[in-house]
A protein has these predicted regions:
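Multi-pass membrane proteins that catalyze or facilitate reactions on polyprenyl-/lipid-phosphate substrates
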Residues: 1-157
Length: 157
């Protein structure tokens, strides 16, 4: 982890979002069910960018999908569908690794935490999909640029 890399990634990612929003192709895919295998592979490859600190996994996949001609709504939905297996696998792996260390009470607390976070995630994703059905990702792009620039000033200042 290097804060300068994170800061640069925020700025570069924000600029990439602005570029993709400005020059995106007219969407040819309006719903998730119509995303082709080829587009899904391209979106999955965009997800690899999230290995760079400061690059958002959802941001990379959403922008990758939009650049490949997917509507904002379908891109956002697909991005969050992609997250489900990754998050379940990571959670399962961590849980299996520490199952011997957790009491029954702690396991029930983990289950409650999982249920609450899943429910709140559904609410937030629904709100985001409602937002992107009416707006662009430009506000998110500017947020990334401003926040990244502030971090750059702090760490290089």
């Amino acid at each position: 982890f290097n804060p300068r890399v994170v800061a640069l990634s925020l700025v570069v990612g924000g600029i990439a979002m602005l570029v993709i929003e400005k020059w995106r192709p007219t969407p040819t895919t309006e719903i998730v069910d119509d995303i082709s295998a080829r587009a899904a592979l391209g979106i999955g490859l965009a997800q690899v960018l999230s290995l760079i600190p400061g690059v958002s996994r959802s941001g990379a996949t959403i922008m990758g999908a939009i650049a490949l001609g997917t509507s904002r709504v379908a891109a956002t939905e697909f991005s969050f569908f992609l997250a489900i297996p990754v998050m379940l696998a990571a959670t399962g792996y961590e849980l299996i690794g520490s199952i011997d260390l957790l009491s029954a009470e702690q396991l029930s607390m983990v289950a409650i935490g999982f249920a609450v976070s899943f429910g709140s995630a559904l609410i937030v994703v629904k709100a985001l999909i409602g937002f992107v059905s009416r707006h662009t990702f430009v506000p998110f792009a500017w947020y990334r640029i401003v926040f990244g620039a502030a971090l750059l000033a702090f760490y290089w200042g």
